């Protein structure tokens, strides 16, 4: 049986670093809620069986009417961490007929620059892989490590950037493998910040697939202006 594709977008975070009272996934960017752009990108990929959005149980900001015409489902099963929300989402995918051998692409709602072309590039690179992998970019900037004992932000040393990549999303893995990896990490007392870290914790080596600068993560207040500029122009294939 051919493995199917599912998308999972954890949306239970509060976006505290963005400096806004409203979670950043619902902030307006280029005339739309930020979440809209990720949903639209996956909706344009008809090969996906379902896109599932996981929100906090007490989320008062989500309004499905703002995403009219897009194909997705919602579950109010967000956890206290990203890892917990993703795990709950993996369990919920079974409601839509997902099996352990099917693929899931986990994507940050705060990366509105994702495009159908990027999604298909990732799927094409990984659909026959034994482990899976992630979108990522080679680190371009010089990296400095801060002196932990410095009160005014002094540099302790410069880190070599050779071989370093910056993780992006989507991150694509088999549902069964990712669930097992997260459960192992939880059992070992580790709350990991992305899915690849959990797969690594299980002893596997995910593959890196070249991403795009437009697929950056909106994190700080000034990032919204950059996202506005990017999303106001058509994506270049």
From Swiss-Prot:
The record marks 161, 217 as: Positions MEP for the nucleophilic attack. Belongs to the IspD/TarI cytidylyltransferase family. IspD subfamily. Signal peptide: none annotated. GO terms for molecular function: 2-C-methyl-D-erythritol 4-phosphate cytidylyltransferase activity. Catalyzes the formation of 4-diphosphocytidyl-2-C-methyl-D-erythritol from CTP and 2-C-methyl-D-erythritol 4-phosphate (MEP). It catalyses: 2-C-methyl-D-erythritol 4-phosphate + CTP + H(+) = 4-CDP-2-C-methyl-D-erythritol + diphosphate. Pathway: Isoprenoid biosynthesis; isopentenyl diphosphate biosynthesis via DXP pathway; isopentenyl diphosphate from 1-deoxy-D-xylulose 5-phosphate: step 2/6. Its EC number is 2.7.7.60. The gene is ispD. This is 2-C-methyl-D-erythritol 4-phosphate cytidylyltransferase. It comes from Paraburkholderia xenovorans (strain LB400). It holds the Pfam family IspD. Keywords: Isoprene biosynthesis, Nucleotidyltransferase, Transferase. It comes from the Bacteria. GO terms for biological process: isopentenyl diphosphate biosynthetic process, methylerythritol 4-phosphate pathway. The lineage of its organism: Bacteria, Pseudomonadati, Pseudomonadota, Betaproteobacteria, Burkholderiales. The record marks 17, 24 as: Transition state stabilizer. The keyword Transferase applies.
């Amino acid at each position: 049986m051919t493995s199917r594709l599912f998308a999972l977008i954890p949306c239970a975070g509060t976006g505290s670093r963005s400096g806004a009272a409203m979670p950043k996934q619902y902030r307006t960017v280029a005339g739309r809620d930020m979440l809209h752009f990720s949903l639209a990108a996956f909706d344009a990929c008809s090969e996906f069986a379902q896109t599932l959005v996981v929100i906090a149980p007490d989320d008062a900001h989500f309004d499905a009417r703002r995403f009219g015409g897009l194909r997705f489902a919602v579950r109010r099963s967000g956890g206290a961490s990203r890892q917990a929300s993703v795990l709950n989402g993996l369990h919920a995918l079974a409601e839509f007929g997902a099996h352990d051998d099917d693929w899931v692409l986990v994507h940050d709602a705060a990366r509105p620059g994702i495009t159908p072309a990027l999604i298909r590039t990732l799927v094409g690179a990984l659909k026959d892989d034994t482990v899976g992998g992630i979108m990522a970019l080679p680190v371009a900037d010089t990296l400095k490590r801060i002196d932990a004992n410095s009160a005014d932000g002094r540099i302790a040393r410069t880190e070599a950037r050779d071989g370093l990549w910056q993780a992006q999303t989507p991150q694509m893995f088999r549902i069964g493998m990712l669930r097992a990896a997260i459960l192992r990490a939880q059992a070992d007392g580790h709350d990991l910040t992305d899915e690849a870290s959990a797969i690594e914790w299980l002893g596997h080596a995910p593959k890196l697939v070249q991403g795009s600068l437009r697929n950056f993560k909106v994190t700080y207040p000034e990032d919204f202006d950059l996202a506005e500029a990017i999303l106001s122009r058509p994506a270049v294939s």
